[in-house]
């Protein structure tokens, strides 16, 4: 199963567990706290007035021994069920003041005070926490503004302090919106509509038994602004592309990117094609490495190779796997002065197809970094940069008999071609992101469950303490035990 669906299923399961836990807690809180055997005996029929009289009869004064209210209520219910409720004539002839108190208690019984935690559960507690946080923030902001106003009044006088206070209020109201707008604008403008193209032109091609060389010139532009113009040799070091990583685990990644830039920008790519296709007769070579963003702001890469009138193009789309799309070179723009035959075309296509997957993955990984780095170079006014030096680019000690394929590139391509151990594939990076998201989801679920348990304990701490005290008293009181066994 895809990691995307696994994480989605885990998130849905976590939300469902949270919802049903909340419903179960709410249902348990709304149930009667009395045991079933006592709830069936009409214990809840006692009014607040009769319970008050029973408390007074048993010597419990209002306002004291608040912890024993539940135990007294239980004793009152037991006495009422046993028929031992006796109200003397003296208690019925109370003075006017006591009757008024009884009426007030009856009114309170009709409209009892409901704790928000008991009425709404976790939602009420969350609402109270939000209100408390808002009050604390308003209080903190008020104190900060008052201290700032006093400081401005002390230094600048009353008129200037008034204007400064107005500015602070406006800044406090609009600062967050302005910050969010700037961040969104920066995110939208970064890399959107950027195009970087590096074209090379190779002449005086010389293919011998032990070396392949040519005169090569490279020209790089960023949004039609020139950032490099000079020989192909050494272009990677002269362009501060900064493709290294500090992490030791990404050392191979740095090596591949650096070597890939040299391979495509310094003319080694057409030299490999010419060396392995010795039968074709080529006098000059044109090529291009292009990275750009399309209308939907998706990064795309393109490799172009032109051999005497025949062009070959490889296109790569970021955030896609080479195994999910067709990776192949296409022959386009065949000019009228094409001198190569069909056999030569088949030979070139066979050579290009061998490492098409490696070139595709490299474009996917290189183009986003190349675009960002080129934008920085353009902002640093690195324009019309012209370099001088030798134009000769060669592959020394290179023969088809000594090694099959380009030795350096094939050595590094083995890691890319293997689906399980690929380091630079976009899908592997996506799996890494989903793994991090899975860890964060599990951590968030654990924190949520822990917070739910803590909130439950906080809301029920008083009831738990009363239950523990009642259990302790019940174990130490034999009379209460006898009454309970007698009712059962």
Curated annotation (Swiss-Prot):
Residues 1-22 form the signal peptide. It comes from the Viruses. Glycans are attached at residues 206, 210, 219, 223, 242, 275, 281, 294, 297, 306, 333, 337, 343, 384, 391. The keyword Lipid biosynthesis does not apply. Keywords: Glycoprotein, Host endoplasmic reticulum, Host Golgi apparatus, Host membrane, Host mitochondrion, Host-virus interaction, Membrane, Modulation of host cell apoptosis by virus, Signal, Transmembrane, Transmembrane helix. One of its GO terms (biological process) is symbiont-mediated perturbation of host apoptosis. One of its GO terms (cellular component) is host cell endoplasmic reticulum membrane. Residues 83-119 are annotated as: Disordered. The chain crosses the membrane at residues 439-459. Residues 83-107 have a biased composition (Acidic residues). The record marks 193-194 as: Cleavage site. Belongs to the immediate early glycoprotein family. This is UL37 immediate early glycoprotein.
């Amino acid at each position: 199963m895809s990691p995307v669906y696994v994480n989605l299923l885990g998130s849905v399961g976590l939300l469902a567990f949270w919802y049903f836990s909340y419903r179960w807690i709410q249902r348990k809180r709304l149930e009667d706290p009395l045991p079933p055997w006592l709830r069936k005996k009409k214990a809840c029929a006692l009014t607040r007035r009769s319970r008050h009289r029973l408390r007074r009869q048993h010597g419990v004064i209002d306002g004291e021994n608040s912890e024993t209210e539940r135990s007294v209520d239980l004793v009152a219910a037991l006495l009422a069920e046993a028929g031992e409720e006796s109200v003397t004539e003296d208690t019925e002839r109370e003075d006017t003041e006591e009757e008024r108190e009884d009426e007030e208690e009856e009114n309170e019984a009709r409209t009892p005070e409901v704790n928000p935690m008991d009425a709404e559960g976790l939602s009420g507690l969350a609402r109270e926490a939000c209100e408390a946080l808002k009050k604390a923030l308003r209080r903190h902001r008020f104190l900060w503004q008052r201290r700032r106003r006093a400081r401005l009044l002390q230094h600048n006088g009353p008129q200037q302090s008034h204007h400064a206070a107005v500015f602070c209020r406006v800044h406090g109201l609009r600062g967050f919106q302005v910050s969010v707008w700037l961040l969104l604008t920066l995110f939208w403008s970064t890399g959107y509509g950027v195009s970087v193209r590096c074209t090379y032109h190779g002449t005086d091609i010389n293919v011998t038994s032990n070396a392949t060389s040519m005169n090569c010139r490279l020209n790089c532009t960023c949004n039609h602004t020139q950032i490099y113009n000079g020989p192909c040799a050494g272009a990677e070091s002269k362009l501060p592309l900064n493709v290294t990583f500090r992490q030791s685990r990404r050392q191979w990644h740095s090596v591949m990117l650096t070597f890939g830039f040299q391979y495509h920008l310094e003319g080694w790519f057409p030299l490999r094609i010419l060396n392995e296709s010795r039968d074709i007769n080529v006098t000059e070579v044109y090529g291009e490495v292009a990275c750009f963003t399309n209308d939907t702001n998706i990064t795309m890469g393109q490799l172009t190779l032109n051999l005497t009138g025949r062009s070959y193009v490889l296109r790569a789309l970021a955030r896609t796997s080479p195994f999910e799309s067709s990776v192949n070179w296409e022959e386009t723009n065949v000019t009228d002065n094409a001198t190569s035959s069909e056999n030569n075309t088949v030979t070139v296509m066979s050579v290009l197809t061998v490492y098409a997957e490696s070139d595709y993955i490299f474009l996917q990984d290189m183009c986003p970094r190349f675009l960002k780095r080129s934008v920085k170079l353009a902002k640093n006014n690195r324009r019309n940069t012209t370099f001088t030096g030798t134009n000769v680019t060669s592959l020394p000690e290179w023969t088809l008999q000594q090694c099959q394929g380009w030795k350096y590139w094939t050595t590094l391509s083995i890691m890319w071609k293997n689906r399980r151990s690929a380091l630079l594939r976009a899908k592997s990076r996506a799996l890494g992101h989903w793994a991090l998201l899975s860890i964060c989801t599990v951590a968030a679920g654990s924190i949520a469950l822990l917070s739910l348990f803590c909130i439950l304990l906080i809301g029920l701490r008083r009831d738990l303490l009363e239950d523990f005290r009642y259990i302790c008293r019940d174990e130490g009181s034999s009379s209460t035990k006898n009454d309970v066994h007698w009712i059962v």
